[in-house]
Amino acid sequence: MTKDRRAALVRITGRVQGVCFRDWTREEAEKLGLDGWVRNESDGSVTALIAGPDGAVSRMLENFWKGPPGASIADVASEVASSVEAPAGFRITR
């Protein structure tokens, strides 16, 4: 991973299921040119792996706090991840 590229594993909690959060995440990630995936978790949260240029990852982390209409974000927790784990393009995994 070059120094201007990074990856983050993100857990978003609140009202984030049943509000098209995964579709919204994919659309936002594609606009920013990010690679990765997003999925619903059984505890009602959403997990995403985002990878790309540092500035785009930072913008996506900010965007997660807004979410799509109908979402109510309680927390956005992120940790450093390896961009090697991110597939090319962006997909919804479940």
Curated annotation (Swiss-Prot):
Keywords: Hydrolase, Plasmid. Pfam families: Acylphosphatase (PF00708). InterPro entries: Acylphosphatase, Acylphosphatase-like_dom, Acylphosphatase-like_dom_sf, Acylphosphatase_CS. It is an enzyme of class 3 (hydrolase). The active site is at 22, 40. Residues 7-94 form the Acylphosphatase-like domain. PROSITE patterns: ACYLPHOSPHATASE_1, ACYLPHOSPHATASE_2, ACYLPHOSPHATASE_3. PANTHER family: ACYLPHOSPHATASE. This is Acylphosphatase. It comes from Sinorhizobium medicae (strain WSM419) (Ensifer medicae). The gene is acyP.
